[in-house]
């Protein structure tokens, strides 16, 4: 089951590259009785439109029908990663410098496992965030291997 995203990445990447788009993430999840293959794509500058998603969906659907790499029945969804796009690759973190992000860690750091704040730097798989706790700002350094989830967030 965990191999599905990497198999699909091999098929989707050439399609996405040919359309000058970016492959952001792939999920293969079961919700209720149904399986969903979700492919998140974007433009390099951000802001993909529905026609671009449809192009990826049509091409990928044909290729999936031909190669048939997934044994379960599933629904294919191709969409934008949204405003709270995941941060997984080095390039994702580098693009997010200066932006407001949410990070959840596997184990507590400074007695906390969830952080929201501005990403101030990212070097050598380590990120530095400026986090607001009540009325004070603190700097938190988190190694990428300790991150369970990272995504862009909306600052209210």
Swiss-Prot record:
Record keywords, A-Z: Cytoplasm, Ribosome biogenesis
Principal localisation: cytoplasm
Swiss-Prot/TrEMBL GO biological process terms: ribosomal small subunit assembly; translation
Signal sequence interval, chain numbering: none
Pfam families the UniProt entry points to: DUF150_C (PF17384), RimP_N (PF02576)
Cell compartments where the protein resides: Cytoplasm
Gene Ontology CC annotations of this record: cytosol
Keyword Translocase appears in the UniProt entry: no
Keyword Ubl conjugation annotated: no
InterPro entries found in the cross-reference section: Ribosome_maturation_RimP (IPR003728), RimP_C (IPR028998), RimP_C_sf (IPR036847), RimP_N (IPR028989), RimP_N_sf (IPR035956)
Family to which the UniProt record says this protein belongs: Belongs to the RimP family.
Protein purpose: Required for maturation of 30S ribosomal subunits.
Matches recorded under NCBIfam families: PRK00092.1-2 (NF000928)
UniProt-recorded name of the protein: Ribosome maturation factor RimP
């Amino acid at each position: 089951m965990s191999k599905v995203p990497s198999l699909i990445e091999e098929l989707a990447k050439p399609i996405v590259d040919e359309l000058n788009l970016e492959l952001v993430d792939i999920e293969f999840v079961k919700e209720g009785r149904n399986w969903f293959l979700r492919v998140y794509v974007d433009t390099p500058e951000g802001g993909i439109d529905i026609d671009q998603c449809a192009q990826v969906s049509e091409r990928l659907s044909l290729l999936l029908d031909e190669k048939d790499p997934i044994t379960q029945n599933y629904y294919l969804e191709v969409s934008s990663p949204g405003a709270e796009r995941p941060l997984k690759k080095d390039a994702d973190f580098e693009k997010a410098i200066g932006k407001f992000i949410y990070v959840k860690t596997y184990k507590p750091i400074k007695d906390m496992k969830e952080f929201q704040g501005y990403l101030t730097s990212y070097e050598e798989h380590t990120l530095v965030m400026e986090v607001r706790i009540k009325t004070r700002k603190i700097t938190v350094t988190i190694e990428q291997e300790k991150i369970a989830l990272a995504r862009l967030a909306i600052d209210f």
